[in-house]
Amino acid sequence: KFVNRLAKVIKTPLAFNLDIKIGDIVVVHQNVFRVFYDMKGKKRKSRSFFIDDLHFCSIDQIYLYRNSEGWNTVGDRCFIKPIKSNQSLTVDKERSLIGILKYGNSSLNDLEINPGDLVGYTPNGEWEFLIEKERLYCMKSNDIVIKYEYKGDEEEYNPSWAHSG
């Protein structure tokens, strides 16, 4: 289900002043490492491929990075932890379009939406990632549409398959 989305930073561009440093681990778009077959059936590597195990990655393909301080988002990205459904009349195990902000960013902080807050988000804007054996949804700050007050029955949801591998 998941393509390897973790990379180690070997070099950073001089043109950008980034908090990402050499040696940091980054979570990138799945197409950076994608291998596909063209119309003639020939195996091709992504346009990000350089040589050996080295790939170029544009800043908009980097969603999260880990340094000595922990995980940090890039730009307007944020990560949401799904919560368990408390509905007895559904087979869905998680609540739709509601979750707990795991990793935020400065624009959300300015709106007083901080990690640990219960938030609602728009449909079809989230991408599923496995970060340290936790299933999280990556989305843009603009996809967060409401901050909820806790009712007390919210519980994080992490499917059992996320713990393997």
Give names to the regions the model predicted.
Residues K1-G165:
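Acidic-enriched and Gly/Ser
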